[in-house]
UniProtKB/Swiss-Prot annotation:
Family: Belongs to the acylphosphatase family.
Catalytic activity: an acyl phosphate + H2O = a carboxylate + phosphate + H(+)
Protein name: Acylphosphatase
Keyword check for Hydrolase: yes
Length: 90
């Protein structure tokens, strides 16, 4: 199991991107959360198997139909939080 901290930049707020991220996380059996940040980016914490996280990242980089992803920063964190499911945080 791994945990990634992901920051997504572009047109990713107000376009259903967090819902898209949650659906992709569920599809890949990941746990964690996604939230909007004050600077216009979206932050994601995702835990799961390495291959599942890689597939999830591919989907995130592609984006949802109404989003336009311009940059994705990924950092593997040292800790696991043991999330039970994947949530949208407000």
């Amino acid at each position: 199991m791994l945990q990634y901290r992901i920051i997504v930049d572009g047109r990713v707020q107000g376009v259903g991107f967090r819902y898209f991220v949650q659906m992709e996380a569920d599809k890949h059996k990941l746990t964690g959360w996604v939230r909007n940040r004050d600077d216009g980016t979206v932050e994601i914490r995702a835990e799961g198997l390495e291959e599942s996280l890689k597939q999830f990242l591919k989907a995130i980089q592609k984006g949802s139909p109404f989003s336009k992803v311009t940059d994705v920063k990924v950092e593997e964190t040292k800790e696991l939080d043991g999330f039970q499911k994947f949530n949208i945080s407000y």
